[in-house]
Amino acid sequence: MASNSSNGTTTTKPPPMPSPLRNSKFFQSNMRILVTGGAGFIGSHLVDKLMQNEKNEVIVADNYFTGSKDNLKKWIGHPRFELIRHDVTEPLFVEVDQIYHLACPASPIFYKYNPVKTIKTNVIGTLNMLGLAKRVGARILLTSTSEVYGDPLVHPQTESYWGNVNPIGVRSCYDEGKRVAETLMFDYHRQHGIEIRIARIFNTYGPRMNIDDGRVVSNFIAQALRGEALTVQKPGTQTRSFCYVSDMVEGLMRLMEGDQTGPINIGNPGEFTMVELAETVKELIKPDVEIKMVENTPDDPRQRKPDISKAKEVLGWEPKVKLREGLPLMEEDFRLRLGVPKK
């Protein structure tokens, strides 16, 4: 960015205004849409929703580190759908109008297994997608995370809260990677006039979650169906809020189509302790299963709950599916994949 200096003061030129042609494309009926990480859990549900609009062409880029072609099998071969095996740490050259940038491992098991790859995906991957957005004049949405708030001292968390974070912890490759990704998004917006949207997504659950990915809802349901004890990490009073995947997808699409840059919290403000969640899974799925306390992992936040006032106000969005309604839908999917019939 150019700057001028006179009389000891420095002024910085404002970013260039996006061209009217760039803005006009976001109101056209035919859209070419790129979804990075589209073979993953949330990404594949987003693809399903986007493909319901017969005027959308959807391109998915995924390296299958945590995603699976099985999540997209009903669209493979469809004339409006294209699947590319691609790692976002390498540049991608496609012509698109919108970019949903979801690519990144979201489970502690996966991002602790390869922390360097995780932070490269967040930083270099986001740089590459911003470069693509700049080249083709696309609007880009980043799925950031509630993890940017760290172990919050403010509860519930609003978008204005800067967080209480550990930049060198075992989870930092993910948490700090997303914080850098948000920084890059706003820097490209200010310097190059890129149309950006940032969603801070909170814990999400539903069908197609990886069965053994280490996240608490999938852990509990898989353990219950296998007849294993539900392992609650001590002390069990730590809280999370759980958003059903269809609600999450609706929130992301409203943010993309709206005129708000964000960041905006997308999540369900219903708050549960880990013991309460385990008891709910036990009640709904396998009442005779044991609940067992185990040692906690490092850097586990004590509480997490979104303030969604902004999403309600500017997007007209709030979640509809309650936890007791969503868990049986996820149970049905897990039963099929684990081969455990309902008795």
UniProtKB/Swiss-Prot annotation:
Cellular localisation: Cytoplasm
Enzyme Commission code: 4.1.1.35
Pathway stated in the Swiss-Prot or TrEMBL entry: Nucleotide-sugar biosynthesis; UDP-alpha-D-xylose biosynthesis; UDP-alpha-D-xylose from UDP-alpha-D-glucuronate: step 1/1
Class of this enzyme: lyase
Molecular function per GO: NAD+ binding; UDP-glucuronate decarboxylase activity
Residues that coordinate or bind substrate: 171, 203, 216-220, 233-240, 300-304
InterPro entries per UniProt: NAD(P)-bd_dom, NAD(P)-bd_dom_sf, UXS-like
Active site positions, chain numbering: Y174
Domain of life per record: Eukaryota
Residues noted as binding NAD(+) in the record, renumbered to the chain: 62-87, 174-178, 215
SUPFAM superfamilies xref list: NAD(P)-binding Rossmann-fold domains
Segments of this protein annotated with the region Disordered: 1-22
Swiss-Prot/TrEMBL keywords: Acetylation, Cytoplasm, Decarboxylase, Lyase, NAD
Substrates-to-products reaction catalysed: UDP-alpha-D-glucuronate + H(+) = UDP-alpha-D-xylose + CO2
GO cellular component, one term: cytoplasm
GO term, biological process aspect, one: UDP-D-xylose biosynthetic process
Known cofactor(s): NAD(+)
Residue numbers of N-acetylalanine PTMs: A2
Functional description taken from the UniProt entry: Catalyzes the NAD-dependent decarboxylation of UDP-glucuronic acid to UDP-xylose. Necessary for the biosynthesis of the core tetrasaccharide in glycosaminoglycan biosynthesis.
Family: Belongs to the NAD(P)-dependent epimerase/dehydratase family. UDP-glucuronic acid decarboxylase subfamily.
Protein's recorded name: UDP-glucuronic acid decarboxylase 6
UniProt organism field: Arabidopsis thaliana (Mouse-ear cress)
Lineage of the species this protein comes from: Eukaryota, Viridiplantae, Streptophyta, Embryophyta, Tracheophyta
Gene that produces this protein: UXS6
